[in-house]
Amino acid sequence: HTSNIEIQNPDLLHSRSKLDFGKGFYLTPLRIQAEKYGERFLRRGIKAMLNIFSLDDERENCTYKVFNSYDGEWLDFVMACRKGLPHVTFDIIEGGIADDQVFNTVDLYFSGIYTREQALNQLQYTKPNRQICITSQYVLDKYLHFQSSKQL
């Protein structure tokens, strides 16, 4: 997780809504992706901190959703979350991130310039980055463990 501060105890109160998978604490298993996100802070002259966590493999009483590709289900879910529409919620959601390249396609779809089919056709050739969104404070407290932080 990249932020402008060290975060040892994440809480959902500080999470923004209307993101790819809704309001939650976002992480990635891809260090290079987290460091690249930190560059956004640095370009604005803001300190960037890479916060490293471990997430228990065994998680009881959690709902978990994985999107393995940028498909119709992913597109519909992201659209509902980004527009703040009602949608099925999960404690943990994992799937592709709407980075700059993907966001352009998604934005064209949201604005009505692309049809759903055109957007999906564009997205099918894109290899998903990985993001994990934890939407449950219970899961954050019980299964996510702060390991260390590093200033980028």
What is each model feature region?
Residues 2-5, 27, 109:
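Generic hydrophobic/packing signal
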Residues 1-18:
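Short aromatic-glycine-(Arg/Gly/Cys) micro-motifs in beta-strand/loop hairpins
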Residues 7, 19-20, 35-36, 40-152:
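Conserved NAD+-utilizing ADP-ribose enzyme module
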Residues 20-26:
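A short, exposed loop/beta-hairpin motif centered on an aromatic-Gly-Thr core
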